[in-house]
């Protein structure tokens, strides 16, 4: 074996990876890089245009043996990474649900990463735990949650990464609560309930918690009820399981479903669940953000009868990913289920039982200082600004909905909910026109047999997204393929919405023209 070739001179970074001056120099460069990115973000195709595997072709097969400069690395970020990004912060981004960023959120994240504390219990970093408890009570007050969900009452809140974590945590606590009563040997009798619009993370969480997939119930919704869960249908499903000797124990209601932002009737569903002694969780991942506005607060009426409530601040609250806020009425149910107390974590503060050890409120042990960025957001912008920020997106979505209704080729599939518009090229206005055009050439019947409205709308969406000027996604609900236009990017303004609609109209005209030509000329 040969000896290593040690250079006599080395940079401060090589001798000290946390050299303060080198951190300052490189930090300024990264901030400048991001500032230019945001300044020029509209120049990029919103949806990445690269092909699968593009990056492996550009990067070396092995990690570098010698250090590389930050200048070289940032150049590669610009040349190789940025082209592979879908630009969620673009003002022309309307896909999925938003992930709204802000200066305060980004800098709060930077502070948290800089401190790099691991706040699994109080003693490991008291400020991390205490700030989280305070901020969660602030947010509860903004949402007008019952005192029973706050630390000033008998409950409390915790920040997690995602809704999936929040639901898994609550299902696990609810599972243990019921099994402590009926015996753990009966776990295969436990049944969970959602609707056919409930987010997939619910059933994924139930599976991880050991609930048999055979015991997942998806209550059917319909367009008549705007795809919200019907209490009578829920009761019928629960009673059927009880009659079969099964044990209903968990209901997940949704305020703002992913597909259409449908709102389940929380109060009525809680009444049904109460009759069977079930744990009720309210998943308000998207729409819960808007419920700090008084005009939307009624959407979560009935929360006082639920056991837990969560929303994702990283979606629509100017707070960078990740930050899911979960409140529970009975924190002891989490602690009993998730507590760990090995010798190496024992300390006097925990022994006093006067502090919160958040490790016992979650699945993982390690945890990030998420409350710091939320604290910066709340202090930097204030409640009034945040409310108006949310309202501006709702207003822009209402404007887009109006534009859709003014074009006879399109229809709004379900009434706009919050800042999401679900629309499509309509059957009556489009298919009939195509049929009439082709019928004159003797091809009308062939069109009706071979082409579907869903195909036309899918082609429209792909045409729009491939152009790169705006980005939307779709949903398929009750057999209806629809385009989703979700307003929520921080930089979006009304003129961007107008531009987006013009893009949709132009691509619709092109798609319909191609359809007519391909059918009538065959």
UniProtKB/Swiss-Prot annotation:
Tissues in which the protein is found: Strongly expressed in all tissues, particularly in thick roots.
Top EC category: lyase
Ranges of the Sequence repeats in the UniProt entry: 75-132, 135-186
Pfam families: Pyridoxal_deC (PF00282)
Pathway: Aromatic compound metabolism; Alkaloid biosynthesis
Required co-factors: pyridoxal 5'-phosphate
Amino acids binding pyridoxal 5'-phosphate: 163-164, 258, 312
Biotechnological and industrial applications of this entry: An heterologous biosynthetic pathway of mescaline is reconstructed in Nicotiana benthamiana plants and yeast cells expressing Lophophora williamsii genes TyDC2, CYP76AD131, OMT1 and OMT11, thus providing a sustainable production of phenylethylamine-derivated natural products.
Positions where N6-(pyridoxal phosphate)lysine occurs in the chain: 315
PANTHER family: GROUP II PYRIDOXAL-5-PHOSPHATE DECARBOXYLASE (PTHR11999), TYROSINE DECARBOXYLASE (PTHR11999:SF96)
Role summary: Aromatic amino acid decarboxylase participating in the biosynthesis of natural products derived from phenylethylamine, including mescaline, a natural hallucinogen potentially used in psychotherapeutic treatments. Catalyzes the decarboxylation of L-tyrosine and L-DOPA.
The name this protein goes by in its record: L-tyrosine/L-DOPA decarboxylase 2
Protein's organism: Lophophora williamsii
């Amino acid at each position: 074996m040969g000896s290593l070739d040690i250079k006599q001179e080395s940079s401060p970074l090589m001798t000290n990876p946390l050299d303060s001056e080198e951190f300052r120099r490189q930090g300024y460069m990264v901030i400048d890089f991001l500032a230019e990115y945001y300044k020029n973000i509209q120049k990029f195709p919103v949806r990445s245009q690269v092909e699968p595997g593009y990056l492996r072709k550009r990067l070396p097969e092995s990690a570098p043996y010698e250090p590389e400069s930050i200048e070289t690395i940032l150049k590669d970020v610009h040349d190789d990474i940025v082209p592979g990004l879908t630009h969620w912060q673009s003002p022309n981004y309307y896909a999925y649900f938003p992930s709204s960023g802000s200066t305060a959120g980004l800098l709060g994240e930077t502070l948290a990463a800089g401190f790099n504390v691991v706040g699994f219990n109080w003693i490991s970093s008291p400020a991390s735990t205490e700030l989280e408890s305070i901020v969660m009570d602030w947010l509860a007050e903004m949402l007008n949650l019952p005192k029973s969900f706050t630390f000033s009452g008998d409950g409390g809140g915790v920040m997690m990464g995602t809704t999936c974590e929040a639901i898994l945590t609550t299902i696990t606590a609810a599972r243990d609560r019921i099994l402590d009563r009926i015996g753990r040997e009966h776990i295969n009798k436990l049944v969970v309930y959602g609707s056919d619009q409930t987010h997939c993370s619910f059933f994924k969480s139930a599976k991880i918690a050991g609930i048999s997939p055979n015991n997942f119930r998806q209550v059917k919704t319909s367009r008549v009820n705007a795809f919200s869960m019907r209490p009578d249908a829920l009761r019928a499903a629960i009673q059927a399981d009880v009659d079969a000797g099964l044990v209903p124990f968990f209901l997940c209601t949704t305020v703002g479903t992913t597909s259409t932002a449908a709102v389940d009737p929380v109060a009525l569903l809680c009444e049904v669940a109460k009759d069977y002694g079930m744990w009720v969780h309210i998943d308000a991942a998207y729409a819960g953000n808007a419920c700090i506005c008084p005009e939307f607060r009624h959407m979560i009426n009935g929360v006082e009868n639920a056991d837990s409530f969560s929303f994702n601040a990283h979606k629509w609250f100017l707070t960078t990913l990740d930050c899911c806020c979960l409140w529970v009425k009975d924190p002891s149910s989490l602690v009993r289920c998730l507590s760990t107390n090995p010798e190496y974590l024992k300390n006097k503060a925990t022994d006093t039982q006067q502090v919160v050890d958040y490790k016992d409120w979650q699945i993982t042990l390690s945890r990030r200082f998420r409350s710091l960025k939320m604290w910066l957001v709340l202090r930097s912008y204030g409640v009034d600004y945040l409310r108006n920020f949310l309202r501006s997106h709702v207003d822009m979505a209402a404007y887009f909905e109006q534009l859709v209704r003014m074009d006879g080729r399109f229809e709004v599939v379900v009434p706009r909910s919050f800042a999401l518009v679900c629309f499509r090229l309509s059957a009556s206005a489009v298919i009939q026109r195509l049929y009439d055009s082709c019928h004159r050439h003797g091809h009308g019947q062939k069109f009706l047999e071979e082409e579907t409205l869903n195909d036309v709308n899918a082609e429209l969406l792909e045409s729009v997204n491939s152009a790169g000027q705006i980005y939307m996604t779709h949903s398929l609900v009750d057999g209806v393929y629809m385009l989703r236009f979700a307003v929520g990017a921080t930089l979006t303004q009304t003129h961007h919405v107008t531009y987006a609609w013009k893009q949709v109209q132009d691509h619709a005209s092109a798609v319909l023209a191609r359809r007519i030509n391909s059918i009538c000329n065959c």
